[in-house]
Amino acid sequence: MAGHSKWANIKHRKAAQDAKRGKIFTKLIREITTSARLGDADPANNPRLRAAVAAALTGNMTRDTINRAIQRGAGGGDGEQLETIVYEGYGPAGSAVMVECLTDNRNRTVAEVRHAFSKCGGNLGTDGSVAYLFSKKGLLTFVGVDEDALMDAALEAGADDVVTEEDGSIEVYTTPNDFGTVLDGLEAAGFKPQSAEVTMIPSTEAELDAETAPKLMRLIDMLEDLDDVQEVYHNGSISDEVAATL
């Protein structure tokens, strides 16, 4: 689940669950393989692949596993021929939800995604219904580093913005195309991100309360459990007090 920094603790807790971990790795490998098949097998020349590799590394996937996935994609052959489709919809309290999928069967995928929305009190929208509320950006998150030094290094590397959150974590934003360059520059300067991804950042938020927040979480869980779903983005905002009860 990708959303906003307020979800970081929930996202990382979910990622640590053994039941989820295997599925997360499967999704990462599919993204790496597809990115290598559709573009250059060298991450330095393929921004989408570079982002997929970065996400896999911060998720503790081994280099060997990553390289095998790249080789499988670059080799073409008779493997899965997947296409990327993004579905848009509405969750509880008018929250905007985008669902990024990799699929070999559009009909199956849209039926499963629509069912999840309907089951959780939301509804699947049309193309463009919520996409305008999001911007695609590279996002690098750092903890326990010197703020001034990181800011200097990030801006030198070509980052768009650097934001310090209330919990002390620091988020570095980039354009999707500059993501790899900024990541390489920061790592060369000695800064290793806690997480690194190209994600969708909402421009507005939908405030959720103790009643609607669990419904959005249920929708996200149902969507993420679908094999064809790679990422779920949303603009739901939940207070720390409500988040602690989820």
From Swiss-Prot:
Question: Any idea which GO molecular function terms this record carries?
Answer: DNA binding
Record bears the keyword Nuclease: no
Q: Which GO terms describe its biological process?
A: regulation of DNA-templated transcription
Question: Where, if anywhere, are coiled coils annotated?
Answer: none
- Could you tell me which Gene3D superfamilies the record lists for this protein? 1.10.10.200, 3.30.70.980
Q: Which family does it belong to?
A: Belongs to the TACO1 family.
Key words of the record: Cytoplasm, DNA-binding, Transcription, Transcription regulation
Give the protein's recorded name.
Answer: Probable transcriptional regulatory protein AHA_1522
Any single Pfam family the record assigns to this protein: TACO1_YebC_N
HAMAP family recorded: Transcrip_reg_TACO1 (MF_00693)
Q: Which organism is it from?
A: Aeromonas hydrophila subsp. hydrophila (strain ATCC 7966 / DSM 30187 / BCRC 13018 / CCUG 14551 / JCM 1027 / KCTC 2358 / NCIMB 9240 / NCTC 8049)
InterPro entries from the xrefs? Integrase-like_N (IPR017856), TACO1_YebC-like_2nd/3rd_dom (IPR048300), TACO1_YebC_N (IPR049083), Transcrip_reg_TACO1-like (IPR002876), Transcrip_reg_TACO1-like_dom3 (IPR026564), YebC-like (IPR029072)
Query: What Gene Ontology cellular-component terms does the record carry?
Result: cytosol
Give the organism's phylogenetic lineage. Answer: Bacteria, Pseudomonadati, Pseudomonadota, Gammaproteobacteria, Aeromonadales
**Where does this protein reside within or beyond the cell?**
Cytoplasm
